Amino acid sequence: MDREEIKVAVLRMEGTNCEDETVKAFRSLGVEAEAVHIKQFYSDMIRFEEQRSVFDYQCLVFPGGFSAGDYIRAGAIFSARVKSVLRKDIEEFIKMGYPILGICNGFQVLVELGALPGFDEDKPLAEKPEMALAMNDSSRFECRPTLLKKESEKCIFVKNLKKDVVMFPVAHAEGKVVFPSGKEDEYLERLTSNDQIVFRYVDEKGDYAGYPWNPNGSFYNIAGICNATHTVFGLMPHPERAFFGYQVGRREGYGDGYCIFRSVVDYLEKL
């Protein structure tokens, strides 16, 4: 697929944020990207020229924010709206090998959708959530740079990432990765054996450490995971806020987040 043929949809609704940064990151790589309201996929109230299909795109992104005010649970309402009208389309999209990225609130949406941890390759969306992103151990909103160690070689979103440790900022109150009580060891074994743990929080020496390096108390210091096919990726930190050098205090060039977006574009060019 030629780069100019690639189309990316950044899904939005009331309360999401960083859509513009995410769109700009993709566009800077020469692909077509747009922010698309969830209603554009199903509402008859939308003008014909603004109506969209999931299959108009080769990559979907669920951005950060506080969708629907994070009422009930973070990402729950956004997920419910997607599930009610797009479940079959999303499942087919994943089976086709097209990538989906969930950033912060978007990670929460993918968990609520049952897309992550995504152990079953034949059933991309579980019937109910198999993990959760709970309130931070600090019981408050955490907003600052974090250091992340790359753990996966198979996730398509980190194929171009050469550094062992990267810096992405976090901005969340509910980012603690938790698994069902009594199944933590089982889940960890499944994730590690299939190379599904993508990033873990570390300190300035590259060692796994607790708070404040792990900003939320996530199990096993997990910051991001992918599904069994390594094409659906969710993480709490924000790579789009570290895409350009000027976002992270550099005068020129790119930040560490550049490699996330470049990796998925390179993947799509090979399809």
Curated annotation (Swiss-Prot):
Annotated localization: Cytoplasm
Residue stretches making up the Glutamine amidotransferase type-1 domain: 7-253
Active site per UniProt: 104 (nucleophile), 238, 240
InterPro entries in UniProt: Class_I_gatase-like, PRibForGlyAmidine_synth_PurQ
Keywords (A to Z) from UniProt: ATP-binding, Cytoplasm, Glutamine amidotransferase, Hydrolase, Ligase, Nucleotide-binding, Purine biosynthesis
Pathway: Purine metabolism; IMP biosynthesis via de novo pathway; 5-amino-1-(5-phospho-D-ribosyl)imidazole from N(2)-formyl-N(1)-(5-phospho-D-ribosyl)glycinamide: step 1/2
Family matches, as Pfam families: GATase_5
SUPFAM superfamilies with a match to the protein in the record: Class I glutamine amidotransferase-like
Subunit (UniProt): Part of the FGAM synthase complex composed of 1 PurL, 1 PurQ and 2 PurS subunits.
Name of the molecule in the record: Phosphoribosylformylglycinamidine synthase subunit PurQ
